[in-house]
């Protein structure tokens, strides 16, 4: 507010000479009337003027005091308004930080959800492939059961008809016997190979006919043996042992695929759990969790009045300058039994698990305060509570 200047204008009185000079000239009757009053009238006028002056001065003092008070209140209001502006600015800064944190968390959550969707799609595809494999295995088992039930295999072997000549000369038969490969010679039994001594001996017509019959018989036996071998091969291919081996192989392959899928699912689950734990530690810090845990324990104790009270003694130090007070609180109760820790050998798998846990604890330690500072804070708060109770 601006300073207001007050101008006091005094009204002229009829008794003063200023009034006679400024006003109109009085008549002769009025002049006589003015000349008539004695010294008593002039004294009364002076007293009334003094009283009016004192009143005006007191009013001026009051007005000046009110103006000063208004100025003081205005200055206090300006200071409060400046403090309010600072508080509003700090609140706006914290709100902007909170918005940024929420944006980052929403981005991480959206990325996690996308990864979870991809994992679910992969799991669905793996399940579909496993179901298809199971259907194929069932079909194979059904076909195998039908084949084992039948156990009768009819194999048709088609061969070109070889027209053998009615008569063969000994020279041709000898040439053919010499031209036979060693492999075919191994297949032939005893008595099938023609004797080498016949080349040197001249044979008669009866002996030539006998040699031709022996050659024809050897060829027929060879064809029979090759057919029997093929039938044996087919039987071996569709035998019980081979079918059982194929069953065992298919089962082993199925078990391997199932184990691989289980391992992959467990790995994905572990990775998701790790990421969710990291996100949880980011959203809810360790201090907050400890506070929630202690509050839960206190609530449980409050609802269970018969809980065990352990004996303890605490020393709290608090300073009231220029004094320092050491307060020792002793609580009676049962002696707390500390659990003994056992040393356990750690293997390579435990080392991996310990490394993962160490990473998690390192992340937690980065944001958690020291234990000593927490204990000092609790002791100071307990000391303040004791002071308040003593003062009450």
Swiss-Prot record:
Residues 168-188 are annotated as: Leucine-zipper 2. Expressed in the heart, stomach, adipose tissue and lung (at protein level). Expressed in testis, kidney, muscle, liver, spleen and brain. Phosphorylated. Present in active and inactive forms. Changes in phosphorylation pattern may alter activity. Phosphorylation at Tyr-158 is essential for its function in the regulation of the ribosomal transcriptional activity. One of its GO terms (molecular function) is identical protein binding. It is found in: Membrane, Caveola; Cell membrane; Microsome; Endoplasmic reticulum. One of its GO terms (biological process) is rRNA transcription. One of its GO terms (cellular component) is endoplasmic reticulum. PANTHER family: CAVEOLAE-ASSOCIATED PROTEIN 1 (PTHR15240:SF3), CAVIN (PTHR15240). This is Caveolae-associated protein 1. The lineage of its organism: Eukaryota, Metazoa, Chordata, Craniata, Vertebrata.
């Amino acid at each position: 507010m601006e300073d207001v200047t007050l101008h006091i204008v005094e009204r002229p009185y009829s008794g003063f000479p200023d009034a006679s000079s400024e006003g109109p000239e009085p008549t002769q009757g009025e002049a006589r009337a003015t000349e008539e009053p004695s010294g008593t009238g002039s004294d009364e006028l002076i007293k009334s003027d003094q009283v009016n002056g004192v009143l005006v001065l007191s009013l001026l003092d009051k007005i000046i005091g009110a103006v000063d008070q208004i100025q003081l209140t205005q200055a206090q209001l300006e200071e409060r308004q400046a403090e309010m502006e600072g508080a509003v600015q700090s609140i706006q800064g914290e709100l902007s930080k909170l918005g940024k944190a929420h944006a980052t968390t929403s981005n991480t959550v959206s990325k996690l959800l996308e990864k979870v969707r991809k994992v679910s799609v992969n799991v669905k595809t793996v399940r579909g492939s496993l179901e298809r494999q199971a259907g194929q295995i069932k079909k194979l088992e059904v076909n195998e059961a039908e084949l084992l039930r039948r156990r009768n295999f009819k194999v048709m072997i088609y061969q070109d008809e070889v027209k053998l000549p009615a008569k063969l000369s000994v020279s041709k038969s000898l040439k053919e016997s010499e031209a036979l490969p060693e492999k075919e010679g191994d297949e032939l039994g005893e008595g099938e190979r023609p004797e080498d001594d016949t080349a040197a001996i001249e044979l008669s017509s009866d002996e030539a006919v006998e040699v031709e019959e022996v050659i024809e018989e050897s060829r027929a036996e060879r064809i029979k043996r090759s057919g029997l071998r093929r039938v044996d091969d087919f039987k071996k291919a569709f035998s019980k042992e081979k079918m059982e081996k194929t069953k065992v192989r298919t089962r082993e392959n199925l078990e391997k695929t199932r184990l691989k899928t289980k391992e992959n699912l467990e790995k994905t689950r572990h990775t998701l759990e790790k990421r969710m734990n990291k996100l949880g530690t980011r959203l809810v810090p360790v201090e907050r969790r400890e506070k929630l845990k202690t509050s839960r324990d206190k609530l449980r104790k409050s609802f269970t009045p018969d809980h065990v009270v352990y004996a303890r003694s605490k020393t709290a130090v608090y300073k009231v300058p220029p004094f320092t007070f050491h307060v020792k609180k002793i609580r009676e109760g049962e002696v707390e039994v500390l659990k003994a820790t056992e040393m356990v050998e750690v293997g390579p798998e435990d080392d991996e698990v310990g490394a993962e846990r160490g990473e998690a604890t390192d992340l937690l330690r980065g944001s958690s305060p020291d234990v000593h500072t927490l204990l000092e804070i609790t002791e100071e708060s307990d000391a303040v509570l004791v002071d308040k109770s003593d003062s009450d």
